[in-house]
């Protein structure tokens, strides 16, 4: 099962956002276990914690460093502990892994041999370090973006408090993986830090740490960190509570306290959305995050650009860049797939050159054959107009990137029809919306678009990515 599906299932089943740190810390071990051999005592304590909490938490988080500090017996203890956790409860290995050279083999070890569901990573070696962990489709990572350690403040707040490094980490890490692959780890007692992170990453799961230290305010943490559904946060069980002989009773009380605040928060957000829709966007566009990512990787640029049609626009949309960002490309393919899977056809056809990678990826996803009409016919070789195998009379869905005038995509469709193929549907990622779909229909084609330019501009403007002047320039077209 995919990690976040497994996590949400446990959140719902146990009505809990709580996770437990399964850390064999001799300094925190209750006195009732101290008369035994230290490893045996820690093992008995960890078994007690699991038995007392399994019905009241959504995840377990063993910290690798504590087990490593105990040497070989500690790693053996880790194996026993992982095996003792009920299989339906997700395991987040707190490793803070940061070594690029060992990332591939370590990912294989923790995910395939140890069987953990997610892992914490340090961000500073970048996407190359994170990528080996993301190739496991049912697993996830949590990126450390902030810690509560006072000594880290000089780094985290650099260069200014208005534009701190920890927010840049959040912004950059969003491009490394989808919300279904990548969450954030935030250690802080400062609700303002969490609020700023939530504002930048409204769609991400956040695992908070250190909130029970002096100065922490649980209600405020929940208020700024929860999403509109009362989820989106993972809350740690206090370490000192794990030493209690009445752990089960105490954790149920904490769960009830958190759920009470969750209920209030959800009601408050719902009421605000009715009266202040321009301020609190409770119901976001389904592709809200993708639109922002397209802007952030410069697929949308401003200036005076001459389009292929000859028209001059105050912006340019360059979707070719998506192939260099696997996470964004994957989301774009999903958008196309949601449309194409409902159509009747025999083959896909990409229009050269911009949509060929998209059509290829889509064909692989849908397990269907692909062809494409050549932009120009070679003067040598087979001189084919259509590349790829096909049979006369087959139905082809045409895939292109953007509809501006419709001229190039209809030229491609006409080439396909001249070879004896039938074309009824044209699917694009962005519709420029100047009556081009009507033009397609007048020529016998049904037009479909994942997004319209007005949807994109609306999301970018509401999110503060573009200013009023840019918004007007886009909407005036």
UniProtKB/Swiss-Prot annotation:
InterPro entries: Aldolase_TIM, OMPdecase_type-2, OMPdeCOase_dom, OPRT, Or_phspho_trans_dom, PRibTrfase_dom, PRTase-like, RibuloseP-bd_barrel
Pathway listed: Pyrimidine metabolism; UMP biosynthesis via de novo pathway; UMP from orotate: step 1/2; Pyrimidine metabolism; UMP biosynthesis via de novo pathway; UMP from orotate: step 2/2
Catalysed reaction, written as an equation: orotidine 5'-phosphate + H(+) = UMP + CO2; orotidine 5'-phosphate + diphosphate = orotate + 5-phospho-alpha-D-ribose 1-diphosphate
Gene Ontology MF terms: magnesium ion binding; orotate phosphoribosyltransferase activity; orotidine-5'-phosphate decarboxylase activity
Chain positions covered by the region annotation Orotate phosphoribosyltransferase: 274-477
Binding annotation for 5-phospho-alpha-D-ribose 1-diphosphate: 374-375, 378, 380, 400-408
One GO term of the biological process aspect: 'de novo' UMP biosynthetic process
Active site residues per record: 96
Source organism superkingdom: Bacteria
Region OMP decarboxylase, annotated ranges: 1-273
Cofactor requirement: Mg(2+)
UniProt entry keywords in alphabetical sequence: Decarboxylase, Glycosyltransferase, Lyase, Magnesium, Multifunctional enzyme, Pyrimidine biosynthesis, Transferase
Pfam families: OMPdecase, Pribosyltran
Cystine crosslinks: none
EC number: 4.1.1.23, 2.4.2.10
PANTHER family with a match to the protein in the record: OROTATE PHOSPHORIBOSYLTRANSFERASE, URIDINE 5'-MONOPHOSPHATE SYNTHASE
Similarity remark: In the N-terminal section; belongs to the OMP decarboxylase family. Type 2 subfamily.
Function: Catalyzes the transfer of a ribosyl phosphate group from 5-phosphoribose 1-diphosphate to orotate, leading to the formation of orotidine monophosphate (OMP). Catalyzes the decarboxylation of orotidine monophosphate (OMP) to uridine monophosphate (UMP).
Name of the protein this chain belongs to: Bifunctional enzyme PyrF/PyrE
Encoding gene (name): pyrFE
